[in-house]
Amino acid sequence: MRKLLFVIAVLFALAVTTNAQQVLTGTYRFDKKLADYTLDKNDGDRVVQMEVTFAKPFDIKPEVLVSVNYLDGDKNTNMRYELKTLSVSRDGFTVQVKTWGDTKIFAIGGGWMAVSGK
């Protein structure tokens, strides 16, 4: 009986470790304190980007989700923006915000989550 319990415990431990996921989270923020910030100036297409480096590299390339939880814009113009990730790798990714037309964004920020099966 002890051997059976030991074998079950070992198999369970192997199953848990082989199905484990790596998960990292963080935040990003763009505002006029950044040297190349242009989302609050002029009209037309404007883009800002930020490199994010993971605290610990993933074993395989993760899926990265980004969200907006802070947005400060001009109340007199339409609010248009596109948020996306670029160049996702095991070591990090680039978060990009784009706006167009007469939209003025004074600041935008949010969170990201990177998830990878081992």
Regions of interest found by a model, annotated:
Residues 4-14:
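Sec-dependent N-terminal signal peptides
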Residues 19-80, 85-118:
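Extracellular receptor-binding modules and their adjoining Ser/Thr/Gly/Asp/Asn-rich linkers
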Residues 3-5, 19-20:
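N-terminal prepro-regions of secreted/extracellular proteins
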